[in-house]
Amino acid sequence: DLHPRVRRQRQMCIRDRKKAVRWIRSAAAVAAALVVLLGCFQIFRSLTPRDGQIPMAGAGAAGEAEVSQQQAQSPEDYSRVYAQIKELKEKERENGGDSYTGIYTPALGMDGIPEAGEENAVNTAGGGSPYDGSSAEKDYSDTNNQVEGVQEADIIKTDGEYIYAAVDGDVYLLRENGGNPEILSKIEKIDTVSEEGENICGISERINDIYIAGDRMVLIKYVADYDAYYDMMEDAAETDAAPANGCVIYGPPAGLAKYTAAVYDITDRSHPVLLNELGQSGTLISSRMVGDILYLVYSYYVPGEIDETDPSTYVPALYLGDAKTEVAADDIMLLGEPGAAQYLTVSSIDVGSPAEFLDTQSILGCGSDIYCNSETLVVALTTMEETNDVSKDKTELFRFSLKDGAVTMESQGSVPGYVLNQFSMDEYNGYFRIVTTENVTHYFNEGGIASAEQEKTRNHLFVLDESMNIVGSIEDLARGESIYSARFMGDTGYFVTYRQVDPLFTVDLSTPSEPKILSELKVPGFSNYLHPFGDGLLLGFGQNSDEESGEIQGLKLSMFDTSDPAAVAEKHSELLGKKYMWSNAIGNHKAILVDSEKNLIGFPAENEYMLYSYSPESGFQKIAQLTLEADGPGDMDYDLRGFYVDDVFYLYSPSGLAAFSMEDFSRISTLLWEE
């Protein structure tokens, strides 16, 4: 069985067409979506480099090159792009699909727009922002970033002097003010959507995430323009696609839904000034910021019918303010055998001067997870390798180089198995490391009766070079279990597999061609997240389970002694709360605060926020159990964050912001967003 996180992840590459503002009721439309899903699970084999790019080398499971080096397209020529998209669309129809216009939109929340913070929670490993500014003398926590120097977006940010909070699609800018935060300004979402029965009109916008870089603020937004969809359909009013009252039945297609990065000058926090808004049609897979450069990774499915004379019908749109254009032909690289009419696009923006995109690179394909450091971006896509009688998980890897905003597709490879999340990947000293879980299913047809049999899952670790050739591996580990968390730290890797107990594997990666298992520790439960906690210690956050039945029995903190990698031991553990207690941090690393210097471990537990300290002698100690309001939770907010500025600890909730003294965690103030 797939890990729950991976069930969602596998759908990400087609999520622009899986959900709509209203449930899709067309059987033909559902069939089309299923066809595209299968298409995304096909094998990608070859890439066509654009002018001036280094020819790529690829690797299959055995490390064999899979890349053909064909002539790049000229900037003005979309003919080969059109031909391949046309072929893919025809295959969809042949397999029972229907290019019904207007059913595919990006992944939506319960209210019809994406949930805030979904993309990617507080690196509270201490220290301030990497950006210089007036608050440099302040001591404050940062977002829980995977890679040092690479910022990840979140719903709450601070630079020590100010706090920036995304709340229900809006953004508040506040002066920190020593525990008595003062709202200075508010940026409101645009929402002109109206409903008449099943029909929807207007524009729906939601601010999902925030980046801060000195006096620049970037808001990651989702925008669905239903009116633009109707304008597009006006000339086809005689068809059933355009309702008589001028509204859209199912919502705009992916081509008219977009994610944007709105860049603001916040020199005066009381009056933020919009400098530009840049974006692309489709779904935002993820984003990262390195210095002042923002990198956006998109997936775009081509909806509806296509017209060779109109590239906007089969090429992703780029948005610069109110202007719209298509990705240039010479920025598109053709895959030899993509499974669906879908693009994967990486774009860059200089937030200091956001007049235009610095660079854009697009390939035919899709993605689900990314790993990013200051020089390299790797996009992973879990697919299926299928024959008539066997299907196997496979992860395609696309490696881009990043240099001052220039994005260059360098190499492509693949490994067996599916990837859990971004922490399953890492690059160190020029080598890319990845852990995967593989499902293998055999299909039988005896006497006209079809059946299937799944092998026990197997887990693998692979080391690849910069050409994405496999140079080292450890395969077939922990049969019947799945990877639940991973962390790479220099020459050492840690990963957790689980079925009934939690084996924590420690791997020596100092010789890339010969990785080896140093130790395997089995303890009850499993860690969903691993985080270094000073020298020789590794924190595990996850869930406890019964050793016999495997039944989940609440949350668990573990501290592992890693001072001797060959004899890793669980030094202390702490079981939390009731049997079915849940934490949003289980699936979102940004909801966890870990600061070994301040001896703080924070995370939400249902609708409360827990704070622990750790002692090598006595283990974990609970130091606070916080709620937004003094008389208890009072609401059902689960998407909580904790962060600190100097000696004030803040609890963020979708309902408000509470401040506490870090001396004794007594309440200083409570601010409710609605007041």
Residue ranges and their predicted role:
Residues 44-675:
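Beta-sheet-rich non-transmembrane sensory/scaffold domains
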Residues 2-10, 14:
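Single conserved hydrophobic/aromatic residue that forms the stacking wall/gate
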Residues 15-65:
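Membrane-interface helical sensory segment of bacterial ECF anti-sigma factor regulators
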